[in-house]
Each structure stands twice: as C-alpha cells, then as structure tokens.
Amino acid sequence: MTICCKDKQCSLSKIEHFHDVVGHCLAPHERLYADTILTLSSFGQIAEKQLLELEIRYDYVKIDKYVIMPNHIHAIIILEGAAGASPRPTLTDIICTYKSLTTRECNAVNKTMGRKLFQTSFYDHVITNEVEYQNVWQYINENPRKWGNDEYYI
C-alpha cells in the first residue's frame, strides 16, 4: 500500500546519505538504512504512531513492514482472518480512517484546520505469493537508500 502526501509535499521525513554512520547516535525519530538516515518530522512521527495504532484499532490488521518517506508511506498491511466471515471495515475504510486521524492530529499540532496532508486516493496491491512478498518487502526496506531515484522524489 502506498499513500502520498498532497502535492507530493515532503512533510513526513528527510533523508540524508552518509559515507560513514559509525558512531552516529540515533534519536528516537531516526531510522538507519545502511548508509542512510531517515529522520521523521513531527508529522512523520504522528503518521508512524497512527499507522502502528491500526493494529490496536482493528484486531485483524497487522502492519508487517513500512517506511515513512519524505512525501509518501509504503506499508505491507496484512488483513488476518477468514475472508467474508463477518462485515468489517475494508482496507479502503481503514486507510480512510488512518488518513483522517493522522491529518487531524497533524493539523492540531500545527494549529491549522482543514489542511489536507494526503492525496485523496491511495495505491494498493494484493500480494499473492512468497516471491512477490519478498520483493515488496525488499523494495520498502531499500526505498530510503534509493530516495534520489524514487518516482516520488522532488
């Protein structure tokens, strides 16, 4: 699943590449990807918190892998349980709620109202086998290191 910021605004994190990260102490809002440090902004920290809270809000949701890039979020979201067992929120419902809660909290922190943080739609893809799962997992894992070549890079 991929969610993009409105107008591709880089408001969630920043990415820096280093030749040598040995000895660099990471802050709680920083993530290390080989020679790359991803630093979450205050909005990115809210986006991460809300993403992880989806597992609490919906007992059948598992956030398996994710990355919060400067202007988009990638995640592997697993919807557990038997398909069609009972009516429950769909992935679209879950993402809509996620975007709404994240935007509302970011606007409260920024003391603005009505500002849109995300694009209206999102991209999803059903992973159908282990090879595809490994490819998507690896893509998410390597995305910060390849930021300069990313299709969402501006």
Can you annotate each of these PLM segments?
Residues 2-154:
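Short catalytic/metal-binding and nucleic-acid-binding patches
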